[in-house]
């Protein structure tokens, strides 16, 4: 996925009220929209390099959106709205080995009245649901982790993926690691032990878990490598 415009580099001052980020651009301080309402654990140190996407829409008050943060020498894609676009690009271009050559790729499909999964795919008449989780947490140099905060919604998705298997679907959960240089992935059970336990339950029930790393630059983000999932 290529960015629609060239990104502008600045220095992070602070993020506040979940949706706002103050950034120093040269001698000017601007407020950018933060398209990530999560904890963004480990990413928000003052002085970190950030990359903003300019916005010329007169209807929008904020003229920049936060896309990338550089921390501990790694670029991290923080726009959660990009995750599904990156995943769809990967599905359509056969970048995910386990999901190659699908006959149908349909985004945002309801499984029941309460739950909508990110994708429904079909291959050889077998239908599969795919849920995508954006990953931005890393606490050592080569291991990405999820979640970065307690996620009841994430736990609900795990249990619903199990329900989908019982109704004849295949279920996949794709951890989309928007962090440079990662080689492994694991569940952050110290952050959300309930999620970890339900992850193990879902794995035993037949949910397929995948972790893929993105190649990130100020011009584009795309899936480039499968990561090993570690179960502690």
Predicted feature descriptions by range:
Residues 178-232:
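Domain-level recognition of nuclease-like catalytic cores that cleave nucleotide substrates
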Residues 142-152, 159-191, 213:
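Nucleic-acid nuclease catalytic cores
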Residues 41, 74-106:
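Acidic-basic catalytic patches of nuclease active cores, encompassing PD-(D/E)XK
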Residues 57-74, 224:
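OB-fold/S1-family single-stranded nucleic acid-binding modules
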């Amino acid at each position: 996925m290529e960015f629609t415009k060239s990104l502008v580099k600045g220095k992070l001052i602070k993020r506040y009220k979940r949706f706002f980020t103050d950034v120093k651009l040269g001698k000017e301080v601007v407020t950018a929209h933060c398209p990530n309402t999560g904890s963004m654990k480990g990413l928000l140190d003052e002085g970190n390099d950030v990359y903003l996407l300019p916005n010329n829409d007169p209807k929008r008050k904020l003229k920049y959106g936060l896309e990338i943060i550089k921390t501990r020498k790694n670029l991290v894609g923080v726009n959660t709205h990009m995750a599904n676009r990156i995943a769809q690009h990967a599905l359509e271009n056969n970048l995910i080995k386990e999901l190659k050559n699908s006959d149908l790729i349909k985004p945002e499909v309801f499984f029941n009245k309460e739950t909508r999964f990110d994708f429904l795919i079909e291959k050889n008449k077998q239908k599969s649901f795919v849920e995508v989780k954006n990953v931005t947490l890393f606490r050592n140099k080569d291991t990405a982790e999820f979640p970065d905060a307690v996620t009841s919604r994430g736990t609900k998705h795990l249990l619903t993926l199990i329900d989908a298997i019982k109704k004849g679907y295949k279920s996949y959960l794709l951890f989309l690691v928007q962090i440079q240089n990662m080689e492994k992935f694991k569940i952050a059970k110290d952050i959300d032990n309930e999620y970890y336990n339900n992850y193990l339950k879902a794995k035993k029930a037949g949910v397929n878990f995948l972790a893929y790393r993105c190649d990130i630059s100020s011009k584009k983000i795309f899936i480039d490598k499968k990561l090993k999932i570690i179960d502690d």
